[in-house]
Amino acid sequence: THSDLPMTIAFDGRMWMMGGWYNGRLPGHSASNQVWCSTDGANWRQAMPNAEWSPRLASALVEFQGKMWLLGGTENYYFGDASSVKNDVWCSGDGVHWECVTNSAGWAPRAYHQAAVLDGKLYVFGGGNYVPDYVALNDVWVSEDGREWTCLTDAAPWHPRLWFSAAVYRDRMWVLGGWSNNPSTNWADVWYSKDGKTWTQLKSNLIWRERHEHSVFVYEDKLWVAGGMIPPLNNEVWSL
């Protein structure tokens, strides 16, 4: 039921879904720390009713060093404050037993961000907070162990943003689309980097329309963009 901004990943032959928000701004809203998995997408098993990390949504979730790594997020979508946003780092090899690698990583607390793994290193970039105070970031951080972090840049050339998507494709990290405020703006730009410091914009005469909260994935050596909020909600599928 906590299907708004949960964390998802394919890991160890299973699809995983964890955390997320329920019921929007309506009574009974809540965040989750449930962990679910499935081998076929139709039949789901609850691996954990309450993981060790606090209920949250909009964390980053990646595979690193043979484990799932969960980074940051927010404990409250619409009704929180600055303390709701997290910068803790957790890892698990089975979705059941979670280890807190650090309660306070070097990067500022954030949600709606992304993480990536490239050349044996773990990267965190962008994101921030939506309400009550809008914060958007375009910094890039790197770690070799998830505990000690180094800032590669305080300001990447792409605009600070929330609700963007990222992937690792052809030995590069990619940042695609997203949203920023003041004024409210959806993005349709595409950036890539091999090291997190130097970013290059990929420009194309034919590209998908500006959007946020879209899906990005790699399949058959192509980079795919699916869905997203333009508005309205969209069901286009594009590939590069």
Predicted segments with their positions:
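Kelch-like beta-propeller repeat domains
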Residues: 1-240
